[in-house]
Amino acid sequence: VPVVVAHGAHTKDLIPIGTFLRRSPHLMAIQTAIGETVRSATGLSSITPKNDRVIRTEVVQMSDGRIHGVQMWLGAPDEAPPERPLVGSLMWDLTAGTATDTVESLQVGGWDPAKQMTHGRAFAEDLPRRELKRNEAEVISMVINPEAGVTICDTWDVIDYRGEPITVGFVARSVPETQD
């Protein structure tokens, strides 16, 4: 079931799309567009059945090709979509304690993509360098005692590589890896 993790720049707490758009006459068309985007692993533009709205989607994809999400915009056919918020996929190997990033996830997380490697970065580098808040401690417990099915949606206030404060929104899910 697709869930909403953000609306514009505002993080949402994994709201099922049917709940988030419960009164929208375009819900079915949006669900279809999301499904087609995931199946084709490419963004699309489609028109709603009444020809009054355009749905535009973009894939959020990990470097190994796995789809981590879909960004979606709905607007009038003659309206230009706003600039999409930058999003990036990141995968933590809870067994090895390492992270695999995309360039976008490094940028969103406040890292300098020109100086950070995308594979094999120590998980500990992602942790805030100060006293932890409760929600941050939950993520650390996810690493120390990995349990399948744990999902966390949150924001962290961090300092980026330029010394600027930023807020990073994220979703973390703990799922067992299957061997290919």
Place the predicted regions along the sequence by residue:
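Charged, amphipathic alpha-helical stretches
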Residues: 1-23
